[in-house]
């Protein structure tokens, strides 16, 4: 008699995805982040669901409902800070996951990669709308500044902004629709994750060497289940340390002041995980140009498979490309720092140079380095 996990229509899908899945024997801890992202999504949906039970999406009561959650709801403060810092962990895992994909050439699985880019946009949109919900000063002004960018679109811009706002400014209608969309999007993301995995399992995983590993596969369970559990324990330790010891470390103090349309905060800035894109946006003096650069800063990921000029898939054996990759990482850290600084000398010029370097590395230097490496290896 066949084992039920191999014969039952539903269990069979789970078995083929998490138990008997053939996986390369050489994949390192950089391959842990996919499962960690799945767990982050589950944590966000669960904590978000319980927070939504106590939250009210009305401009008059939103701020106080969050205060009520923290003060009066049983373990409400844990839920709130798990959700807020869970978003930070989500983005840390996302950036590492994408970085791994670039370093080891996983982007050559074009369907998986493109769905991943759409997922990244969806998660960023969800996080942005979530930041608006507590209705603090930074929530309100962040929403005003970022939604206002749509007005840079020629001809339809102003109409589009007022349509998004549901009025002539960020107000009650905006908050209500942002709450509705913030609740809905994670479930759409979960469905897209299924598609992401579906495409991945069509090809199988890549590995650090970038060489096909069909001849050397091992079952996912128990080898990678136990490896993923180790990654999970380490991530949860980091998340819980953040939640229990420094819950406001990554937040903005301005968000503890209720939203006031008559008082603009001195420095409007988004959460830390958007600062690199915000720095690129601010580094261009023209409004439309800034918006285009902002979108391209993420959309450029779609160009990476098209610009792959190397005869090798992975960067594991390509020192020139490795140097450029780590230069790109340093550049992104610089942009993140600049995004949190005021618009004054010397931050303006540093931001502009870092923005130019970002696009230059991806569009020009990396493809050229790959061609040079091909010649050095006489390929």
Curated annotation (Swiss-Prot):
**Binding residue positions for heme b b562:** 83, 182
Q: Name one GO molecular function term.
A: metal ion binding
Question: A Pfam family matched by this chain, by name?
Answer: Cytochrome_B
Where it sits in the cell: the answer is: Mitochondrion inner membrane
Task: Give the record's membrane topology.
Answer: Multi-pass membrane protein
The record lists the membrane-crossing segments as 33-53, 77-98, 113-133, 178-198, 226-246, 288-308, 320-340, 347-367
Positions binding heme b b566 in this chain are: 97, 196
Cofactor list: heme b
Cellular component GO terms held in the UniProt record:
mitochondrial inner membrane; respiratory chain complex III
Q: How does it assemble?
A: The cytochrome bc1 complex contains 11 subunits: 3 respiratory subunits (MT-CYB, CYC1 and UQCRFS1), 2 core proteins (UQCRC1 and UQCRC2) and 6 low-molecular weight proteins (UQCRH/QCR6, UQCRB/QCR7, UQCRQ/QCR8, UQCR10/QCR9, UQCR11/QCR10 and a cleavage product of UQCRFS1). This cytochrome bc1 complex then forms a dimer.
Known function: Component of the ubiquinol-cytochrome c reductase complex (complex III or cytochrome b-c1 complex) that is part of the mitochondrial respiratory chain. The b-c1 complex mediates electron transfer from ubiquinol to cytochrome c. Contributes to the generation of a proton gradient across the mitochondrial membrane that is then used for ATP synthesis.
- Other facts noted in the record for this chain: Heme 1 (or BL or b562) is low-potential and absorbs at about 562 nm, and heme 2 (or BH or b566) is high-potential and absorbs at about 566 nm.
Give the similarity note: Belongs to the cytochrome b family.
| Entry protein name | Cytochrome b
Q: What organism, scientifically named, is this protein from? A: Rhinolophus ferrumequinum
Recorded name of the encoding gene: MT-CYB
